[in-house]
Amino acid sequence: MSTPVARSATRWLACLAWLLAAVLLAGCGVNRPLARQAAARVALERPQQLDCTRSDHCAIASAYAELARRARSDSRAEAPVHYADALEQGNEALLLRVHLIRAARHSIDVQTCIWAEDDAGWLVLDELIQAARRGVKVRILADQLFALDDVDWLARIARAHANLEFRLYNPTFDEAVTQPVEFAASLLCCFSRFNQRMHNKLFLVDGEIGIAGGRNYENRYFDWDQQFDYRDRELLVIGPHAGAQMQASFERFWAHPRAVPLTRLNDVNARIMREPLAAQDLAMPAGVDAARIEALRRRALDATALAALARRMLRIGVVD
């Protein structure tokens, strides 16, 4: 049985917690003057020139792109054609992502919950930036609570290229990085909204080559963690009907009011205004295994090996 002293202490702690939440709430909200200044600096510093002037934006040849062309050609409204393959191996799933990024001609849309600042996370981000520079429209949507807690990275991504857009879903207190005190306050004041996280994972190239399943962007999802790796499964689907469905799903999330551009986040904007951009490249994090990243990049250009993987694709009909 609790004593009067214990009950009184509990009430005081509860009052202090609510007071803390109220103080944090009073200070939340987008700093609009700062946002305008940061947006202006981003517009000024973000490059628009392209590394490629070809109409295909220097996309590499790909057996998967050929399957997409074949599915598009053979499909009819009443009888769509698709190709599908289950991706069981994490390393293979990462290899295909890098290959498909380099094979993209027009657009890449990526949606995820977790994005870590490790080997896999840096590699995919760097490849997406390179795709944007050659003319591909790149959009990334990640959950704020579990993606990229390095404000330096985010400030640099915001200015990487005019073809690259990055949004965070449901940011806490209009910031990219949630501090422990803010996390606790969110649980107290607004748990219902705070708990609405985005767990969807989608990787879509040119609106017709899509990967959906359980993998986020972190070493342990791609068999690259030396201590512990997840066993996940994804489905690679190629074709117009499924591609349109995946595109529509992404667009709904992208247009949602809780999908917030980086220049609407106070901590990112403060970093943008404090540190003029010296270079557009993301620095490789300390401890990253550069050798295995380079090895995977070479494999992503191996047309013979990738064609062998593409031969596993099964021709199917409707995908729902």
Feature-to-residue mapping (PLM):
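Charged, low-complexity intrinsically disordered terminal segments
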Residues: 28-201, 205-320
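Bacterial N-terminal signal peptides
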Residues: 14-26
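N-terminal secretory signal peptides that target proteins for export/translocation
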Residues: 1-11
